[in-house]
Amino acid sequence: MKIVKKTLDIRPEYFFNKNNIDENNIIEDENNVNDENNMEVVENTSNYIKEASIDEKDIVFFDIETTGLSAINSVLYLIGVAFYDDNSWQFIQWFADECDDEVKLIDAFFEVLKNKKYLIHYNGNGFDIPYIKKKIEQYDMNYTFENIESIDLYNTVKKYKKMLALDNCRLVTIEKYLSIVREDKYNGKELIDTYKEFIKIYSLEKLKGDLDKSSILLKDLLLHNEEDIINLLAVTRIKYLDDLFAGNMIFDEYDIKEDRVCCKYHTDYKLPINNNIEITRENCIVKINTDNSVVIEIAIYNEVLKYYYEDYKNYYYLIKEDVAVHKSVAQYVDKEYRVQAKPSTCYIKKEDKYVPAFNYKKDKDTKRMLEFKREYKDKQSFYQLSIIKDMDKDGKTVLYELI
């Protein structure tokens, strides 16, 4: 088993002005062989941009390379990881220069996972993790992924694929969208033949003391896996979209127009978009801009809506007036013009200007706001715009709290 170790320096320009890797850095150095484990160690230094938003000490990024999709009928020939240790980010690759090195790779991998909380990957839930689980079962090994949280950035990219106008959800596609430069020219499938060719000639070249051809093949195999992992550190910025849509933004101001309310916000983090985005919904328009500003335009409706009382058993429905009145008052109405109210008929009507109700925190202010609907079973409810304006305090409208 060959081990490649690198220390990663934090330099943002890495992905936008990346230097070519010196070929000599991946050729095995006989002076760095660990005799006890027969492991060859190659040292190098590279750079990357750190974009993860969770505690870096708890993170492991990983990716695997195999000779096929089936764990039973293929070989696990490379595992790469990046993790924070000793005040710097470390990058390690375990490469199987013999086909029976799989157990060594898995042992080394799970040694790194000890005491880590997050395992970050790209489509690892769909392939990498199930594949390793099968290998663990195949070799009757005592390892599990149950004690570490899996974060699959593929699922995040898939969620925003349409919004970002991506052709597909492949890693190279989101890398290109985020302007991440990739030197590797091959995909995992193409490198299967490269690995098979490496295995054929490596032992012969090692006996001859001439590793020229196998070293070139090894470089291609390692580079693909390296860029899959290191570029993934930059792809983590896509998670900021989750923060955005969870409401993690700063309110600036609002403006009430004739037919809409415009609420303006900004984020204190760089949004992972390369063009302005506009999302249109039934009741609002969301504009997400490259300058990290966000504008939400909420429609204003001028119509007659209904407020439904919850304690309908204490109300009569007045047939002519088409409203519900409390029994203490309605008892004086002729019986032929009143009936016991039902949940769907226990309402009052009011013509006013309304805004749609979105998710909000039910604090002492919003609890006392009346929710109006068009019909009883409607999921969409509304608030009176006049009430919201009256409740505005210190330039921070309750409307902001509602969205």
Predicted regions and their residues:
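Short beta-strand scaffold segments in enzyme catalytic cores
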Residues: 79-81
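DEDD superfamily 3′-5′ metal-dependent exonuclease/proofreading module
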Residues: 1-62, 67-74, 84-403
